Amino acid sequence: MLNMLSETSHIQQTARSFAESLRNFVDKLIDFPKPLVALVQGGAVGLGCAMLPLVDAVYCSERSYFSTPYIKLGQTPEACSSFTFPQVLGMTMANNLLLNGVALTSCQAKQHGLVTSIFPHDQFKQHAMSCVRRTAMQSSEAMQKSKELLRKSSQTQLKHVNYCECNILMERWASEQTLTNFRSFVS
């Protein structure tokens, strides 16, 4: 009995620690003053997909795909995706990704506004880096001030959503169902 209580306590502490780390990471993305660019040359799964609306540009290869298999794992949305996905993708597509675990192709992701540009897979690096260099050559001061204006009105709301999502994730990660689903998913 003591072993079970000790194990349960350890699982809860681990879930709390993971949730706090995730919350801090996502808060840093929300507050980051300089342009953030994501390059996706394969699968953007889970957090890798969920955080994309928090960056300023997403360049992907034609072979990329985007997936959030949360429900399959017994997990809930993260990285503010419960808020940003309906805004960016529309409610129907957000539901498909977050509730049904449907993956998006690169073309679907671009069509729905999750991706900025798609490049041929074999030329991805050169095209993506050309875009990154073009961004880097702009006035950094003007870029930061513009980003501040674009993000200011949603920062507080995003941080609140992040806080709520992480609290629920902490519960889910400590639940027996989610632990069983994780074990099954990994094996």
Question: Locations of the language-model features?
Answer:
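Residue-level recognition of specific faces of alpha-helices
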Residues: 4, 18-21, 28, 51, ...
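Alpha-helical interaction segments
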Residues: 8, 15, 56, 60, ...
